[in-house]
């Protein structure tokens, strides 16, 4: 038995990434995930429970919902086993984050076109199972809004990243980037007797 928490349980994942005392871990993970695109300096955790707009509409509870210092919204989900319509659920979660922005504008009395000046929403799904749906067929699936014929960016307001851990097969020695080291640690944390990479990555000290 390893010495460390199981990040694939609800308690373990939220303790690792979803607490004030551990938010440096979340920031480091996201910065490694988006290396070369942007740098996050701080995050503010938001209410994870999003109620339905009416009594007959179901709400949702995110694993982690936070806003960065430059106002990017992040939903980070851990799914330990396959469930039907997982990709559809992640799209629904993103829509709730946009609705939350709309409510903020409504309460401030703003009107169009300000109402539609959304900030970007990123949904990061860590999947500890082999997908059965055709949408996810490799370790990292990166989805953005693009124009089909030119593949040029249509809008930066919505992004999905699906990380399917069974497709990640690198050994400790083969991990080179900070992101690869994160994935290795997450995948094997429950059975590790010691954390690797502490000499190269101080966040694991």
PLM ranges: what are they?
Residues 1-205:
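Elongated, amphipathic alpha-helical interaction scaffolds
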């Amino acid at each position: 038995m390893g010495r460390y928490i199981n990040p694939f349980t609800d308690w373990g994942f939220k303790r690792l990434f979803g607490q004030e005392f551990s938010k440096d871990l979340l920031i480091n993970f996201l910065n490694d995930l988006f290396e070369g695109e942007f740098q996050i300096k701080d995050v503010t955790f938001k209410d994870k429970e999003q109620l339905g707009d009416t009594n007959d509409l179901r709400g949702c509870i995110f694993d982690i919902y936070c806003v960065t210092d430059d106002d990017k919204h992040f939903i980070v989900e851990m799914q330990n086993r396959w469930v039907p319509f997982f990709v559809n659920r992640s799209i629904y979660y993103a829509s709730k984050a946009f609705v939350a922005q709309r409510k903020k504008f409504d309460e401030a009395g703003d009107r169009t076109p300000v109402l539609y000046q959304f900030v970007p929403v990123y949904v990061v799904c860590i999947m500890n199972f082999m997908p059965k749906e055709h949408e996810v067929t490799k370790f990292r699936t990166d989805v953005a809004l693009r124009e089909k014929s030119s593949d040029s960016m249509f809008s930066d307001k919505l992004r999905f990243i699906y990380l399917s851990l069974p497709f990640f097969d690198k050994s400790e020695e083969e991990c080179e980037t900070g992101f690869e080291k994160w994935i290795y640690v997450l995948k094997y944390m429950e059975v590790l007797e010691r954390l690797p990479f502490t000499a190269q990555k101080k966040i694991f000290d």
